């Protein structure tokens, strides 16, 4: 996706916290989050988030698709006020290593568990026959 692509929450997935501090993936598209979703998800201040995010984007040589996953429209009182950048999963993971809170630690743990235990593939087996089962 390019930076001029506009998305809604229906077009993407994002992370939220469940009741017992479990991570819930919401949505059905590619994972991408806005800065305000980072602040809520990682429970950090805007100042800390902006500092760490700018440091990450300036310091590390990232490809353009690793930097942004599009934009989402921002509405205030029903009026379009602007656009917020969406950051892809690569930035979310890298940012979690720049933050030191419990939420970032649990997110890193979740990502490592997902990588170690991939979702099992379901194999379909078709049996061709020319008669009844009896």
What are these regions (language model features)?
Residues 31, 44-45, 57-62, 66:
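N-terminal entry module detector
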């Amino acid at each position: 996706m390019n930076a001029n692509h506009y998305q809604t929450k229906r077009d993407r997935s994002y992370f939220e916290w469940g009741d017992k501090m479990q991570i819930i993936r919401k949505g059905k598209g590619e994972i991408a989050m806005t800065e305000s979703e980072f602040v809520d998800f990682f429970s950090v201040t805007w100042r800390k988030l902006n500092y760490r995010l700018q440091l990450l984007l300036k310091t590390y040589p990232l490809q353009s698709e690793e930097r942004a996953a599009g934009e989402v429209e921002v509405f205030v009182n029903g009026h379009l006020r602007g656009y917020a950048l969406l950051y892809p999963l690569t930035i979310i993971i890298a940012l979690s290593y720049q933050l030191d809170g419990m939420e970032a630690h649990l997110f890193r743990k979740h990502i490592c568990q997902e990588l170690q235990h991939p979702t099992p593939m379901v194999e379909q087996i078709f049996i061709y026959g020319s008669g009844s089962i009896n």
